[in-house]
Structures are given as C-alpha cells and as structure tokens.
C-alpha cells in the first residue's frame, strides 16, 4: 500500500500560503483586514496626536503665561531655584508630548498611509489575475460539462433506438447506425475534453493558484515587516524620554521585537489549513441507463466501522465479482458506484461563479433519469473573489443529495468525531481503531503534553487564570473536527482552560453522580476516598490518575514558587471538574463547595496514581515504566483525530500495529541477537516513502508491513540530539553501558532482523544503499523522523561537503527547516542567541541602506562619502568571503536562488538602481569638472552595486539564521558582526578639501571598492534588467534653499484666507546684532513733533547712572517741555532696539513734562538694572534739592514702568511667534500634497521655518543659551519629496518652539537682540493678516 507523497507535509519546508490551495477567499479576506488594521492604526494615532498636542499646549501656556503674585523678594534663594526648576520640568514635559506628536506623524502615520496605498494597488492587481485564472478554469469545466451532457444524451438516444430496431424497417436501422456513430464521436470528444480539463486543472492547482497565493503572502510579509520597522523606529526615537517613561518604552520594544512576519504567516497557515486533499483528476464515466433498472436488493449491513469514511460518509463495498453483474446495473449498484465516484472526488473544489453554477445546475438533468424537467435552480450571487471547494465530478448532484437523505433517514450520519459533550467510553471506542493500546482518551494525553511543552509548571496562576474565550471555542471546534493543529506559541492558559472544559462537558463526570454523596460525606477520610476511587471503572481510575499526576507535579514546592498554585488552590479549581452536584438547591450547592475542595485536595496530596500507558502505537516496553513522566518532552507534531478511520479496508489492515511477541519469544530473540557475530545495522536516514515516521502525523493511517518499527510512547524525547550539528548516526553506547541499553534496543532489533541491512546516508541527495560492511555494535539509530528531516534538501545546491560536523564547512541546504521546528528543538539560550543575531543582521541592513541613501542624496563632504563607501565595501567583502570562500563555497547565483526558493524576505533583498543624478558632494566643483564627474559616476556605480550585493547577503543570512539548528553555525555567523560599526569617523582636517584633493581622494577610494568576485552582467545591467527597483529618494534641501533664505517667504494668494499671510519682507536689512555699546551712558528724553518715533533710552551695563547739573546743562540729560506732544506719547510704542553680546542695553521711550529750571544740585541716581529699586545720593558738600529729587523719582518710576511694559511686549511677542508657527504647522498638515498651490504654500512655510530656525540657532550659539542638542528626523527614502519636505518643516517648527520656550524659561529679562530678531516676523504676519482681512471684505 503506497502513500501519496504529495499529501505528506515536509517538515523541512516552511509552510506558506501556497499550501492553502483552496483557501484563496480566506486569505484574500485576511489581507483586506490587514489593510483595515493599518487604517485603524493611523486613525488611532491621529486622534492621539490631537490629544497630545492639546495637552502639550495646555502645559506650555500654564508655564509661559503664569503670572506669579510673588515674582521676587521672598526669603529662600534655593526655594526660588527649586521652583524655577519645577516650572522648567513642566515645560520639558510639554516638549516631550510635542515630540511624541512629531514622532508619531513622522514614523507611523505618514509611512503607513503610503504603505496602504501601495498595498491596495498591488492587491487589486492580484485579484484581477486571480479572477482571470478562475474564469479560465471555469470555462474548461463548463466545456467538459457540455461534452458530458452531449455524450449522455446521445447514449440515451442510441439505447432507445437500439431497443426498437430489431424487426423494424431499414430506416430505423440507419438511424441506429447514425446514432452509434454519433455516440462514438461524442465519446472521443468527451475523452479529449477530459484530458484538456485535467491539463487545465493541473496548471490551475500547481502553477496559477500557488503564484497567486505566493503574491498575497509576499504582500503580507512586507506589510508585517514594514509595520514592525515603523513601530520600532518610533519607539527607538523615544529612548531619550524621561526615566519614568523608559519602562513602558522598553516593554513595548520587547513586544515589537517579538513580532516575526514568518511566524505570523506560519501561524495563519496552521490555523487555516484544512484536511482537504487535492481533487483527483477527472475520470471517464460510462453512460448508465437509469431507466431500465429492476427493484433494488435489500440494503447491506453497514454496522461495520469500516463502512464509515473519514468524513463520516458511507463507503459501501459490493462483494459481487464483475462476472456476476447484470448487463444493466441495479439501483443499489448505481447507488454504490455513485457513492464511490463521490468518494473519489471528495475534498474537491467548487467555483462560486454565476456561469458555472448555472451550467452545472441546468446540466444535471441530462444525466438524471429521475428528473426529466429542465427547471434551473435559483442562482446564488457569488462572493467577489470566492474560491470555494469545487467538484471534479460533472455528474448530477441530485444523486448525492438522495444518498445523504438515505443516510440521515437510517441514522447513519456521523458527527465527525465529537470529543466534547459525550461519554468517555464512546471516545475510547471511537479511537480504538487508530490507537488500540491507548488506555485513556487521546485528548487528555495531547493536552497534557502540550501543557508540559508550554512550561505549565512555571506559569503563574495556571489553571486559575482563564484563557481567551474565542481561542478556546476555536480549538474546541477544531478538535471536534479532528484537527489537532496547535501553534507552538499557543497561550498556555488557553490549553489549561480547554482541559478543564473537557472535564466539565463530558456527559458523565469522572466521579459519577451515584458516588457524589459518598465523596461529600468522606471528604476528609483518606481510606474511604481511596475505596471510592477503586470502585470506579478502570477507565475513570486511569484518567483520574493521569490528570492527578500532572497536578501533583504542578503543586510541588519548587514549582509553587513560580506558579503560586499550591494544592488547596488546585483543588479549588478542579473540584467542579471532578465532581458535579445533582442538587438544585443553592444552599446545598454552596454548602458542598468546601467539602468538594477538601475531597479533591486529599486526592491530589495523598493519592498514588496508577500506571497509565500513553503509547500511541504499541504496548509499553518492558524496559520503561508505563506511567507517564511529566518532565519529558511534548508531542513531536500535531496529530489528527483518533476518531478518523480509513476508507479502505486494506489500509486498515496495514495500519494495524504489530502484535507483541510472547516473553519466551522475546528472550529467544534477545539471546540470538547477543550471540550473533554480525549485529544489526542502524536504520538508514532515508525513510521509505510508504511509511510516515511522525509519531502523531496527520496522515499516519497506513504503514507498510515491511517497515515495522518500535512502538513509540508519546513521552519519548530526542532532546539529547543536536539535529543541526551531529552526524546522522550517533555513537551513544559504549562497552561500559551496553548492558544498560539492551532493553531499549530490544524492540528495534526485533524489527531490524526482518529488514535488509542499510548503511547511513553519506550526502543529502543519496538514496538508500546496501551496507557493504557491518556496523559496529555501538551504533544506535537516530529517530527516523529526524533522519528524514536531515536527509531532505530544500534550498541552494550544495557546493561542497565538509567533514559532516555541523554546518561548518558545508552548505546549510540539507539542514534548513521551518522556524517553528527550530524553536521546538531549541532551548531558551539558543533562541536568545538566534534572536540577537537576527536583530543584528536587521540593524546592519537598515544602517547600510540609510548610509547609502545619505551619501547619494544629501549634501555632504567628499571625505564622509568616501569613508562611508569604504565601510560598506569592507562589510560586503567580509560577508562575501564567509559565504563564497571560507564557509560554504556558494556563488551569488546560488544565494539568489536560495532566496527565491525559500522566500527569504527578512531583511528584504533590496536592489537599487544606479542613480542618474550626481551626488551632492562638496566641493561643488566636483560635478562641474569633467574628470572628477566621471570619477564620481564610477564611484556611484560601484557603491550602488555593492549595496545591492550586501543586501542579498544579509537577506540570505537572515533567512538561514532562523531556519537552522546549529550552535556552531550560529556562532560563526554572529562573529561576523561582532563590534562592527558603520558610523564614519569625522576628521576636521578633511572637511574642506579642494577640487584637486577631492579628486585624488576619490581615485584612491575607487581602487579599494573592487569586490572579491567581479560584478556580473545582471548586476551591471540593473537599470535595464530590473524596472521596478528602488531609487533612493529623500528630502531635498533645494526645495527651500533660496539666496534670501533668511527672509520670510511670500505665500501664494490662493490660500491666503487659510494662511492669513501674504506679501513678503526682506530681512536682509534687519540687523541680527548691534555694535557694542560705548562705556559712556546717555539718558535722553526728547519731546519733538518731528521725532516722536525716535525716542531712545540707552542704558549701559554699568550698575549706576550719575546725573549731575553739569551733565544736565550739557544736555546729557535734556528735557523739553512741549504740551502739544503729550497726546502723541503713546502713538508709536515700537522702538528700535540695539544690544551687544557683551553688555545689556535697554531702549525705551520716555516723555516728561517736568520743569528743568532747577539744575543746581548734583545727584547720583543709582539704578540697578536687575531690580526695580532705585536710590539717590547727593554730594555731602551740596544742599538737598527737593526739585531735583522729584525729577529723579519721576524719571525712575517712568523707567520702571517702561521696562515692565517692554517685558510684557517681549513675552507677548514670543507667545505670538509660537502660536503663529504652530498655526503654520496645522495649516501645512491640512494641505493636499498633490495640489500645486498647496505645494507652493508648503515651500513658503518651509522657508519661513528654516529662516527663523537658523536665526534662532545663531542667536543661541552667540548668547550662550544651553539648548538641548538637535536630533535630525528620520527620512523615509521612498517617500515623495514633498512628504519629506513636510517632515523636515515639522522638525524646524518643533525646534523653534523648543528654543523659544527654553529661552523664556531660563530668563524672563528683556533681551533686545531676540526682540529685534522676532519683531520683523511678527510684523510681517500682522501685515499679511490685515491684507487678508481686506481681501475677504
């Protein structure tokens, strides 16, 4: 009996969407939901930006507009300093939330919106291709249907004519001949159409569907990978947040790092994969006359379980030979043949198409004699892209419906293997055929070992914390359907809840209702409890023992430290699972709770479990205990339902396990084996295709009688084998411990004596060979499943084979396996090293591509560009030497084929086109000079090809790392990236190179950029050969660089109503700093009709102002009384201010109406610029002059008021600038990037922001303000240039707000330089607002 290899899953090959050949509709819906998820993410983060922005503004206004009642003068300078720091911390908190808004917009919202557009376009293209493929297949099936109908019609006519032709006229005979000829022709057409349809079906299933599914998988891989990278970059940018946010950020980073697009795909495939097999090819169905049939014989006895198919249908076997069949089949034979035909095409496909459905329904009547009408069935509207199960049978569906009705009428419809809500005895009967030696329900064994695999004993709150209800119901449904596929990363709480659910839902509890009262009465009596257990059926006793053993291990003190579940806690949880009260009185129910707990607790603490055989394929061996060991490893792979049986009786016979021999026979065989001079050789690593060596294989239904094997218990473990690095045959037995292992080898030797000796595999592509020499008596065969995994190759051709010790020196092709298989075989340390190595590969991939984009698109120095290209080349050569020379002797073509074959996409193998634009390197003469420009083109070509090559290498290594289990190989790959830094070193000596120096530098660099292996023609022709490769796109400073970049921009009139700004101002005339003031100080007060706007008050940094009569007489202080000018004092408060970096000068406007006739006394007016107090001292040799004192007092009060007014204007100006620049940002975010006017507006806002930022940067550097370092935003090179311009402008605005708020928080004193710097921007904004108001009116 052979096994269809196409249906046997290859554990080495990672599962993909191509395995879901009948799941296009499911995958398509899942991909659409993935796009909806991206939209949900953007919607959520947009709302979060609004909240963060509002909160940031509220905190900023609280600090900046807070008016203290005690600004100064109170006791406690340290308290004042502390209070200032608290306000500054609040401002820092506000800036933090502002930074969050910027990071979310830059790193999440904008990239994901672009990704959504790209995914939707590509999904639309895939759907169009899928629809074409489906329609083509539909047409082929419709043609076959038509040919079948024509054949059946002609056959029917021929039979009718033949029946009346005897003894009739010659005309009737000619009609019969003509009808026979038509039948022959129709028969040929029918057969030809079958071949054509089968060809179309084969192409559809093996080429078109896999391509479509692979395209969808590629989109999903990209989506998950890109979203992960966006999240990662966002939270990486938040690492500089305050310490109180670090914990949450670190946890989120760990969760993000745990995202693996390949694991996500594997989990989806595992949950979506059905047990349907490929539909069999269309078969020729001869015409059967359904009209002339005698009455059917009595129905056969179908009580035998062999008559039930795995899907619950009836498989009726007819015992009559072909010779005894009548000419026309009976109704029963028709039913049997029809059922067989249906079984042959079970698990087939069906297309949801209007045309096909109509054809199928309308054509059914041609071959159905029970219904002569041609009434079509009601059409059903198909789904958009629904590829459902479609049938390869073109016969009528009414026969199947009739058969199903007959099955239901006689009560034979099977429920498909329900294991919940049924009796435990029924489960044992149903699974007896597949697992005859299993003493307890299979579901208990499976769940227990799954719990052990998920480290149940170290899980806090296990059995107490409930699992996810949706996941529990999903697993329950799948288990009832016979699908035991469970993800390796399934939540342990879900599995634990499923075990409790099964115990609660079985029809009769393990302690039946008849003994419930006894259990309650003797809850504290151990002997009585043990008697009650011994009185139970043996099946109940062993099931209880199997579960109690798990609970006892869980309640050990060593494990309780971690899971917090001691015996009382476990008893409280499991008492409702073991006992059920039949009473409905709430008082009785509540009163029995503690007694139930006490009863179960006594069982867990003191009951000694019985020995239970959990072997799936044979009785327990004599050398091992039949009781289950908790600490042994879990199930190798998910099994199928034990309730499913084979449809073929022969298959059932072949799947019957080998009966154990008697003890005497075993002793005789053992003695013969010990006396034999030629011991049996180990099993070959290549397995027979007729045998599936998986302990719990989903397809283990048949086993060749020539390949018997030792019954393997579920708890058997192979954790001592290092699959990736050990030879296929392991010497584990020596002369000292040979006797200890005799019992373990006994059953293997019994089976091996029946087979020919086989030698181990010598290479990955060899087949089974005969052993020329006997093996040593110390060789022990590796598990056949492991041999099968190791023997199969799935990837790159093996260039050379090393010494066989691991992967060192040989290609990893023979050892690649699915990531889930690697995780299952690995311990925590190996997985941690693997994750660290994979993360390092991803980081280097990101750094290389970002560095390449920087040196080819952003303005930089020649030295920086050359150093960066040398670093990239050095890393490339290191990887190239490792892959092509030192390690595996691969070629670049081998690597590309491996990437394509195994679908390596993490990190993605990006290929850049060679840019057509020259890089922006300084000096700019490089591009203008002919010689240097040619050198630059050669350098640009070499760097691009090198980056493409290193992307291929990193993609290959990233895929290999997660698919191998070899510590040596992982260590060798990790050493490649140890302490490797891709950050170019800056050297101030080479910042300003001349044209000649730069040319020489490029020449020397070019000589070092040559790869180890020359570039191939495909690589050199990358621009021609690959049309959809990536070109590095980034933010272009040219969009906002103008000669007058320091001047505010002119914004288009189209959006003046939105911008509230128009016109332009030339800021080149605005002085950013004034000349230093002289040592003398003059206080001037002028009242003049012609100079009302030029009243200046200059105060030097000197702490005193000396006012004397002589200075007054010399007009050092001049006061002109003019009452006519009093009304003009406040007409023009704007004053031209000047200051220097070394002194503080204050300019104000003062108007006095004071009589200056008394100039006889000398007065020293001491005014402190940092305080509002003023004291006057008069010379001792002069008399006090009250008039002069009054003048000075009034002057001081006026100066103080003007200073306060200027401080208010100064603060208000900063607030206005902050509000203005934030409004510009809101406006920019609301503009449509595709509109030309909006693009002009964005450029204008960018110019304004850049000019203001540069001015503030110069001011802070000259004034010595301590502003936190600027961090350049991360630019996505694939974005549009205006998208990147928008990102940079947002960064400029955030920097402006940060500088202004920090300056204001450090010092509230009036600063004339900053005032002069900001005033033109504010005036320009006010003028634009006025113009807009006029235009609107």
From Swiss-Prot:
Q: Enumerate the SMART domains for this protein.
A: FCH, RhoGAP
Record-annotated site: Arginine finger: 464
One of the record's GO cellular component terms: contractile vacuole
Q: Which Pfam families match?
A: FCH, RhoGAP
From start to end residue, where is composition biased (Pro residues)? Answer: 293-302
Subcellular location, record wording: Cytoplasm; Contractile vacuole
- Region of interest: Disordered: 279-328, 345-392, 612-689, 733-781, 794-821, 1041-1102, 1114-1166
Q: Name one GO molecular function term.
A: GTPase activator activity
| PROSITE patterns membership | F_BAR, RHOGAP
Extent of Low complexity compositional bias: 621-637, 645-687, 734-772, 1064-1102, 1114-1159
Residue ranges of coiled coil: 830-859, 1189-1219
Sequence ranges of Polar residues compositional bias: 345-358, 1047-1063
Return one Gene Ontology term, BP aspect. signal transduction
Query: Does Cytoplasm count among this protein's keywords?
Result: yes
Pinpoint the Rho-GAP domain residues. Answer: 422-611
Q: Which InterPro entries match?
A: AH/BAR_dom_sf, F_BAR, FCH_dom, Rho_GTPase_activation_prot, RhoGAP_dom
Q: According to its UniProt entry, what is the function of this protein?
A: Rho GTPase-activating protein involved in the signal transduction pathway.
Official protein name in the record: GTPase activating protein homolog 3
User: Which species does this protein come from?
Assistant: Dictyostelium discoideum (Social amoeba)
């Amino acid at each position: 009996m052979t096994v269809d290899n196409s249906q046997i899953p290859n554990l080495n090959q990672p599962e993909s969407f191509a395995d879901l050949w009948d799941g296009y509709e499911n995958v398509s819906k899942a991909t659409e939901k993935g796009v909806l998820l991206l939209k949900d993410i953007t919607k959520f983060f947009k709302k979060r930006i609004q909240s963060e922005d509002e909160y940031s503004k509220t905190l900023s206004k609280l600090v900046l507009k807070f008016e203290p009642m005690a600004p100064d003068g109170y006791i406690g300078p340290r308290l004042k300093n502390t209070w200032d720091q608290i306000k500054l911390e609040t401002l820092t908190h506000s800036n933090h939330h502002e930074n969050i808004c910027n990071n979310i917009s830059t790193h999440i919202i904008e990239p994901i919106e672009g990704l959504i557009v790209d995914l939707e376009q590509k999904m639309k293209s895939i759907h169009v291709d899928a629809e074409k493929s489906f329609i083509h297949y539909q047409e082929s099936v419709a043609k076959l249907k038509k040919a079948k109908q024509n054949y059946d019609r002609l056959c029917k006519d021929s039979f009718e004519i033949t029946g009346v032709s005897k003894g009739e006229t010659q005309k009737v005979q000619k009609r019969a001949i003509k009808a026979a000829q038509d039948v022959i022709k129709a028969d040929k057409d029918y057969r030809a159409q079958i071949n054509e349809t089968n060809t179309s079906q084969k192409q559809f299933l093996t080429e078109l569907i896999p391509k479509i599914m692979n395209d969808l998988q590629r989109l999903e891989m990209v989506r998950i990978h890109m979203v992960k990278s966006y999240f990662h970059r966002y939270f990486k940018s938040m690492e500089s947040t305050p310490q109180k946010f670090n914990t949450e950020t670190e946890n989120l980073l760990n969760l993000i790092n745990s995202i693996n697009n390949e694991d996500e795909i594997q989990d989806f495939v595992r949950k979506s994969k059905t047990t349907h097999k490929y539909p069999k090819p269309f078969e020729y169905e001869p015409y059967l006359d359904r009209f002339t049939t005698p009455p059917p014989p009595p129905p056969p006895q179908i009580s035998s379980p062999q008559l039930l198919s795995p899907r619950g249908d009836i498989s009726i076997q007819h015992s009559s030979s072909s010779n005894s069949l009548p000419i026309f089949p009976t109704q029963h034979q028709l039913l049997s043949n029809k059922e067989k035909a249906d079984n042959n095409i079970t698990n087939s496909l069906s297309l949801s198409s209007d045309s096909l459905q109509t054809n199928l329904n309308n054509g059914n009547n041609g071959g159905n004699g029970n219904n002569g009408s041609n009434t079509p069935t009601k059409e059903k509207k198909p789904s958009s892209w629904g590829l459902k199960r479609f049938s390869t049978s073109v016969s009528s569906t009414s026969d199947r419906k009739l058969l199903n009705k007959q099955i239901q009428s006689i009560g034979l419809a099977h429920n498909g293997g329900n294991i919940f809500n049924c009796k435990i005895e029924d489960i044992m009967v149903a699974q007896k055929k597949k697992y005859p030696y299993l003493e307890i329900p299979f579901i208990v064994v499976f769940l227990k070992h799954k719990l052990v695999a998920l480290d149940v004993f170290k899980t806090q709150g296990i059995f107490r914390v409930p699992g996810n209800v949706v996941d529990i119901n999903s697993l329950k449904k799948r288990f009832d359907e016979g699908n035991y596929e469970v993800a390796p990363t399934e939540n342990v709480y879900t599995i634990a809840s499923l075990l409790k659910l099964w115990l609660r839902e079985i029809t009769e509890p393990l302690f039946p209702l008849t003994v419930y009262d006894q259990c309650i009465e003797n809850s504290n009596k151990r002997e009585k409890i043990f008697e009650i257990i011994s009185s139970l059926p043996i099946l109940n006793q062993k099931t209880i023992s199997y579960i109690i053993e798990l609970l006892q291990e869980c309640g050990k003190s060593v494990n309780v430290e971690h899971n917090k579940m001691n015996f009382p806690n476990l008893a409280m949880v499991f008492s409702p699972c073991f006992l059920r009260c039949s009473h409905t009185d709430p008082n009785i129910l509540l009163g029995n709770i503690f007694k139930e707990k006490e009863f179960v607790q006594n069982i867990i603490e003191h009951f000694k479990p019985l020995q239970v055989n959990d072997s799936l394929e044979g009785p327990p061996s004599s050398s091992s205990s039949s009781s289950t060991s908790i600490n042994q490893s879990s199930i190798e792979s998910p099994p199928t339902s034990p309730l499913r049986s084979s449809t073929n009786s022969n298959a059932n016979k072949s799947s019957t396990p080998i009966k154990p021999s008697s003890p005497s026979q075993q002793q005789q065989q053992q003695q013969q084996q010990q006396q034999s001079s030629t011991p049996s050789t180990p099993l070959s690593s290549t397995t027979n295709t007729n045998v599936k060596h998986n302990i719990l294989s989903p397809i283990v239904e048949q086993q060749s009688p020539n390949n018997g094997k030792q019954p393997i218990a579920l708890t058997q473990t192979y954790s001592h084998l290092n699959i990736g690095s050990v030879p296929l045959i392991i010497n584990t037995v020596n002369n000292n411990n040979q006797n200890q292992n005799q019992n373990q080898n006994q059953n293997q030797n019994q089976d091996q004596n029946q087979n020919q000796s086989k030698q181990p595999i010598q290479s990955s592509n060899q087949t089974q060979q005969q052993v020329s020499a006997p093996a040593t008596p110390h060789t022990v065969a590796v598990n056949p499943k492991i041999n099968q995994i190791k023997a199969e190759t799935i990837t790159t051709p093996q260039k050379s084979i090393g010494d066989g010790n691991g992967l060192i020196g040989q290609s990893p092709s023979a050892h690649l396996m699915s990531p889930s298989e690697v995780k299952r075989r690995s311990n925590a340390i190996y997985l941690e090293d693997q994750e660290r190595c994979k993360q390092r590969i991803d980081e280097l991939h990101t750094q290389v591509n970002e560095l390449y984009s920087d040196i080819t698109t952003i303005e930089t120095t020649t030295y920086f560009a050359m150093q960066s290209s040398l670093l990239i080349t050095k890393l490339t050569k290191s990887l190239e030497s490792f892959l092509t020379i030192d390690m595996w002797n691969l070629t670049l073509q081998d690597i590309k084929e491996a990437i394509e074959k195994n679908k390596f996409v993490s990190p993605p193998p990006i290929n850049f086109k060679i840019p057509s634009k020259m890089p922006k390197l300084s000096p700019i003469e490089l591009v203008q000079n002919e010689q240097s420009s040619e050198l630059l083109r050669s350098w640009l070509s070499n760097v691009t090809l090198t980056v493409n090559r290193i992307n291929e290498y990193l993609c290959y290594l990233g895929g290999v790392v997660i698919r191998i289990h070899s510590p040596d190989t992982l260590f060798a790959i990790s050493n490649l990236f140890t302490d490797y830094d891709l950050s170019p070193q800056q050297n101030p000596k080479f910042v300003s190179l001349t044209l000649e120096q730069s040319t020489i530098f490029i020449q020397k660099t070019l000589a070092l950029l040559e790869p180890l292996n020359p570039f191939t023609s495909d690589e050199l022709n990358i621009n021609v050969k690959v049309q959809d490769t990536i070109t590095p796109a980034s933010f272009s400073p040219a969009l906002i660089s103008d000669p007058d970049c320091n001047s505010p921009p002119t914004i288009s009139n189209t959006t003046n109503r939105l911008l509230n700004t128009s016109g332009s101002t030339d800021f080149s005339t605005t002085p950013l700093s004034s000349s230093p003031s002289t040592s003398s100080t003059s206080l001037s007060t002028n009242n003049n009709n012609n100079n009302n706007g030029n009243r200046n008050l200059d105060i030097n940094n000197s702490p005193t102002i000396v006012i004397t009569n002589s200075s007054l007489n010399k007009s050092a202080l001049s006061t002109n009384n003019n009452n006519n000018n009093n009304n003009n004092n406040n007409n023009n408060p704007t004053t031209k201010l000047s200051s220097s970096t070394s002194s503080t000068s204050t300019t104000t406007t003062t108007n006095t109406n004071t009589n200056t006739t008394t100039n006889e006394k000398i007065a020293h007016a001491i005014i402190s610029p940092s305080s509002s107090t003023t004291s006057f001292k008069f010379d001792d040799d002069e008399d006090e002059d009250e008039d002069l004192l009054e003048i000075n007092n009034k002057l001081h009060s006026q100066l103080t008021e003007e200073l306060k007014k200027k401080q208010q204007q100064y603060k208000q100006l900063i607030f206005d600038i902050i509000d203005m620049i934030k409004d510009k940002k809101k406006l920019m975010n609301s503009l449509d990037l595709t509109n030309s006017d909006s693009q002009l507006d964005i450029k204008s806002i960018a110019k304004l922001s850049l000019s203001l930022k540069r001015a503030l940067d110069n001011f802070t550097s000259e004034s010595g303000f301590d502003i936190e370092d600027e961090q350049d935003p991360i630019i996505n090179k694939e974005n549009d240039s205006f998208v990147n311009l928008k990102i940079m402008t947002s960064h400029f605005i955030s920097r402006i707000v940060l500088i202004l708020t920090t300056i204001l928080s450090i010092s509230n004193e009036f600063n004339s330089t900053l005032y002069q710097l900001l005033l033109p921007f504010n005036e320009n904004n006010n003028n634009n607002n006025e113009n807009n108001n006029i235009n609107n009116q």
